[in-house]
């Protein structure tokens, strides 16, 4: 047995450890929080990378779908029932024209998508927690509802931002700086930023691969595949039934995974344009330029989607390859959740006077 196989078995065993019955509810609550935290880290990879006609996101045991003016979420309860929720949605580029400007629109779209995605994840986590709570006996005081409270969500956001900065900004920069001390060749502007980018990419791929070993997150990746299949069926104008949806691919060019990979690649070249030499100056540049890199990556994704044979389209190819991990073939019940979510979003869209036409 190889070391990698042993590590995978140990990791899977630890995450799926059988629990004593008397501690089951508490530990399931903590496990749900852990799933919620990991899913928040994966949020950009699970989200769509554009403000499109129809898009979506995988959540815990469910799928969120959005149309131009509505969004809906469908989550599978442990009982087998599907819990749904839908709300109207304002399209940013229609509300504020300046939000549709090139580069800036990418930053605003991602921020809006992340906010909506976090709300969807919180809803799905609360659905899972609701099933853990047994009903109060007749005459007994009402039990406090198990849910992701405001302070838990706030701590999660702060921790997630800190994790992102430490994992993908601080650590690669620190490692490359230490390599520069070992060999001066790593101090050259091009070499330094190239190595820094490769380390950052390696950490990202390691994180994605590591999360895929956890059964709960593998199911999130299956729902991600269900979301892609359903969007493909809708874009082709086909009926939204399980058999039809299952006939489509799980790999979608506008996936957030492709967007993240583009961000990783573009950042290498952008950092090369700023010849700062001290550690903290380089670190500051990486934080300050994050919105610019996000906006540029968004424009490249848009251009590549319209010009499939261009050089920019090749830059999005690694994201499609990575979807072999972040999307998995869904079960019929998972595809059904994606269909229900899209149906609810479409119904609300029509109620608000919207009309979706596939050209």
Feature locations, PLM:
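Divalent-cation
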Residues: 20-137
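Polar-ligand-bearing catalytic/cofactor-coordination segments
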Residues: 34, 45-55, 59, 63-65, ...
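Juxtamembrane "helix exit" motif at the C-terminal ends of alpha-helical transmembrane segments
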Residues: 123-127, 160-185, 263-285, 294, ...
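Membrane-interface starts of transmembrane alpha-helices
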Residues: 148-156, 184-199, 278-285, 289, ...
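Select subsegments of transmembrane alpha-helices in polytopic membrane proteins
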Residues: 150-168, 252-263
């Amino acid at each position: 047995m190889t070391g990698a196989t042993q590590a995978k078995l140990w990791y899977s065993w630890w995450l799926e450890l059988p629990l004593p019955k008397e501690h089951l509810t508490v530990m399931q609550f903590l496990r749900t929080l852990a799933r919620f935290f990991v899913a928040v880290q994966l949020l950009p990879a699970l989200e769509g990378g554009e403000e499109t006609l129809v898009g979506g996101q995988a959540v815990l045991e469910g799928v969120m779908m959005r149309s131009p003016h509505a969004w809906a979420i469908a989550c599978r309860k442990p009982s087998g029932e599907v819990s749904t929720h839908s709300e109207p949605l304002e399209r940013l580029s229609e509300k504020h024209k300046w939000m549709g400007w090139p580069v800036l629109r990418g930053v605003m779209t991602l921020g809006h998508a992340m906010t909506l995605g976090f709300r969807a994840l919180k809803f799905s986590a609360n659905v899972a927690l609701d099933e853990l709570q047994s009903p109060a006996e007749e005459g007994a005081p009402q039990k406090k509802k198990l849910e992701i409270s405001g302070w838990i969500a706030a701590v999660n956001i702060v921790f997630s931002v800190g994790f992102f900065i430490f994992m993908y900004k601080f650590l690669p920069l620190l490692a490359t700086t230490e390599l520069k001390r070992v060999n001066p060749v790593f101090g050259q502007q091009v070499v330094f930023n190239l190595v820094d980018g490769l380390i950052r990419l390696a950490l990202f791929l390691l994180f994605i691969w590591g999360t895929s070993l956890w059964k709960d997150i593998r199911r999130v990746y299956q729902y991600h595949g269900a979301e892609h299949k359903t969007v493909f069926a809708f874009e082709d104008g086909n009926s939204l039934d399980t058999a039809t949806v299952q006939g489509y691919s799980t790999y979608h060019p506008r996936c957030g995974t492709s967007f993240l990979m583009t961000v990783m690649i573009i950042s290498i070249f952008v950092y090369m344009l700023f010849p700062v030499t001290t550690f903290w100056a380089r670190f500051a540049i990486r934080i300050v330029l994050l919105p610019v890199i996000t906006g540029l990556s968004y424009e490249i994704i848009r251009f590549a989607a319209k010009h499939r044979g261009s050089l920019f389209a090749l830059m999005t190819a690694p994201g499609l390859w990575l979807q072999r991990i972040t999307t998995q073939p869904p079960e019929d019940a998972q595809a059904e959740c994606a269909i229900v979510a899209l149906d609810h979003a479409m119904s609300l869209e029509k109620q608000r006077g919207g009309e979706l036409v596939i050209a």
